[in-house]
Amino acid sequence: MNAYKITFTPKTYIDYNDDTIEPIWNYLGCLYKNGQILKNYELVENKDGLWALITLPDGEALKPENNNIYVNKYLAAVKEHFNVSSEFLGRNMNHDESCSCQEPSWYMLYTDWMLSESPIVCGDCGKAVPLYKLPHILQSDEHYGVLGWQAAYKSTDILWTYCLSDRFTFRQMHDPKSQLSMDGISICKAFEEKIGKPFFYYLFNNERTKKMCPICDSDWKIYGEKTFVDYKCETCRLVADKTSKRGVIVNTEPIIKKGRV
C-alpha cells in the first residue's frame, strides 16, 4: 500500500481553531469511511500549514471520481480556507498490496485483530479489495457499516486472543448463528445482491474444522483444488480453514498471505 501526504496550505493567515480544523478532520474521516484511506491517518502542523499523513489502498483511491457525497462536501469546506495537494511518499511496508484483479470471481468477508486493511478479500488472488471500489450497501452512502462490523470483530478477536471471555468470544467468531456472524453474513448477502458475484463469510475455528457445513450439514471440504481456504459451502456461502491461522501473539504478519498467503 502507498503512503501519501496531503498538504493543507492556508490561503490567508488563519487561526487553527475548531472552525478551521474540524472540516479537515471530517474530510479525512469521510475518506476512511468510504474506504479510500486506512484508519491510521495523522494530522501534523508545520510552519507552512498542515499535513495529513495517510495510507492509501492503491494509487487510484484519491481520484475525485471515487469520492462520495460526504467526501466532496467536506473537501469543499476545507478548500474555503486551504489549498489542498497530495504527494506520494513511498510504499507503506506495514501493509501488503491490495487486489488488482479486474473482475474477481468471488469474494470473502474476513478480518482479524492484526489487520487494518479492507475486510473484503478477493477470492482469486487472496488480497484485500479496497472498499471504495465496491458499491455502498445497507442503505448507506458510505462503508461505515462494514467498517463497524470489522471493528467489532477485531475487538472480539483481541479479547479471545488474550483469553478473556473465551466461550463468548469464540462463539461470536465460530458460530454462524452468533450476532457477529449474522451481521457479517448480512453484509455478504447485501454485497452479493449488488455485485452479482458469490460473497462468502469466513468462520473462525481454533481446532480442526468439521467436515460438514455447520448450517446445512453437507460435505464442504475442498478436495484437490488449489485455494487459500480448506472448506467452502456454496449453498450457505461459508468458508473456513482446517484451523484458523491466528490466535498466538508472536508475529503480526497478516494472515491474508496464503493467498491470503
Please identify what each model-predicted range represents.
Residues 1-170:
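Domain-scale terminal segments
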Residues 170-176:
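Surface-exposed cleft-lining segments at the edges of enzyme active sites
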Residues 178-261:
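Cys/His-clustered metal-coordination modules, chiefly Zn-binding fingers
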